[in-house]
């Protein structure tokens, strides 16, 4: 169900806090937005990026930062739904960064599940993906 305005604003604020901490390479700020539970989960864009638990999430963020000079995400569109203390987000936007002295940008898609604990919304599951290269608009598969 569509989130009410108060929930949508709180969840969007949590997502913005997450992207700001990531862009600023603030590991403690980033970890403070995650659920502390060992079953939090992340799918990244790399073939090996399947992470479970806070320690693996931390490892992934630190690896991302070690391989880039800058890396940021901006969300251009989002849809937020909720039921009780659980909210789920679908969003798309643009990733931008610099690695090896070369600037890059890419369209990205993201889904997330957040849980409200007290007055905070915490990320429990997160997935980021890239539209399939070579798949033209209107086609269901990239061939």
Where in the sequence are the language-model features?
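A solvent-exposed, acidic/Ser-Thr-rich amphipathic alpha-helical stretch
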Residues: 9, 27-82
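Residue-level signal for tight coil/turn positions that link beta-strands
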Residues: 77, 84-86, 118
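Short, cysteine-centered beta-strand-loop-beta hairpins and adjacent loop/turn segments enriched
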Residues: 67-68, 96-104
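Residue-level preference for beta-strand/loop junctions
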Residues: 69-72, 85, 89, 106
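Hydrophobic/aromatic beta-strand elements that line small-molecule binding cavities or substrate pockets
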Residues: 61, 75-80, 93-95, 109-115, ...
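Short, low-complexity N-terminal intrinsically disordered segments enriched in polar/charged residues
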Residues: 1-36, 141-143
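Short, well-ordered beta-strand segments in beta-rich or mixed alpha/beta enzyme
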Residues: 30, 43-45, 87-97
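Short beta-strand edge/turn micro-motifs at domain boundaries
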Residues: 88, 105-137
